[in-house]
Amino acid sequence: ITNACFEPANQMVKCDPRHGKYMACCMLYRGDVVPKDVNAAIATIKTKRTIQFVDWCPTGFKVGINYQPPTVVPGGDLAKVQRAVCMLSNTTAIAEAWARLDHKFDLMYAKRAFVHWYVGEGMEEGEFSEAREDLAALEKDYEEVGVDSVEGEAEEEGEEY
C-alpha cells in the first residue's frame, strides 16, 4: 500500500508526482500495520530512487501509525479494510496543476465571468489580479526549486575527480 501512494492514479490533485521532486512526505498508516514493514517499504523507495527529493531535504519522510482499524460509515460507499494509509506530500509536480488553474482563471477573468458576484459581496476587482500574481509567483517558486535541485546535482557530478 505504501507504493500505491506514489501512483498518479491515487493522487487527490491531477498531477504526475514522477515529474517533480518531493520536499516533504508524511505517511499516516492506520490498522494492522507492522512498523518493520513500513520502514522496509520506505527504505526500498529510497534505495530504488522511486521518488526524488530536493537536494536540501534528502530524508524527507515522517511516519505515523495508528493501530485502530480504519472506520467505515454505515451505509457508506467504502468497504471495510484491515489497513489504510494516507500520504500528505509537498512536491514540485503541483506546479502543473497550478498552471492549469492559472489558464482557467485567465479565460474566465477575461470574460469577467462571476466577477460581479464577488464584487457584490464586497471584494474589489484588484484582489483578483493580486491573487493571480500570487499564484503565478508560487508556481514560479516551485518550478525554480525543481530546476535548482537538478542543476545542483549536475554540478556535484561534474566535480568528481
Swiss-Prot record:
Reactions accelerated catalytically: GTP + H2O = GDP + phosphate + H(+)
Cofactor: Mg(2+)
Top-level taxonomic group: Eukaryota
Chain coiled-coil ranges: none
Cell compartment(s), UniProt: Cytoplasm, Cytoskeleton
Pfam families, per the entry: Tubulin_C (PF03953)
Record-level GO cellular component terms: cytoplasm; microtubule
Keyword match Cytoplasm: yes
This enzyme's EC code(s): 3.6.5.-
Keywords: Cytoplasm, Cytoskeleton, GTP-binding, Hydrolase, Microtubule, Nucleotide-binding
Main location per the UniProt record: cytoplasm
Entries under Gene3D superfamilies matching the protein: Helix hairpin bin, Tubulin/FtsZ, C-terminal domain
Cited SMART domains: Tubulin_C
SUPFAM superfamilies in the cross-refs: Tubulin C-terminal domain-like
Site (Involved in polymerization): 161
PTM (free text): Undergoes a tyrosination/detyrosination cycle, the cyclic removal and re-addition of a C-terminal tyrosine residue by the enzymes tubulin tyrosine carboxypeptidase (TTCP) and tubulin tyrosine ligase (TTL), respectively.
Binding partners and assembly: Dimer of alpha and beta chains. A typical microtubule is a hollow water-filled tube with an outer diameter of 25 nm and an inner diameter of 15 nM. Alpha-beta heterodimers associate head-to-tail to form protofilaments running lengthwise along the microtubule wall with the beta-tubulin subunit facing the microtubule plus end conferring a structural polarity. Microtubules usually have 13 protofilaments but different protofilament numbers can be found in some organisms and specialized cells.
Protein family according to the UniProt entry: Belongs to the tubulin family.
Protein purpose: Tubulin is the major constituent of microtubules, a cylinder consisting of laterally associated linear protofilaments composed of alpha- and beta-tubulin heterodimers. Microtubules grow by the addition of GTP-tubulin dimers to the microtubule end, where a stabilizing cap forms. Below the cap, tubulin dimers are in GDP-bound state, owing to GTPase activity of alpha-tubulin.
Protein's name in the database: Tubulin alpha chain
Species per Swiss-Prot/TrEMBL record: Lytechinus pictus
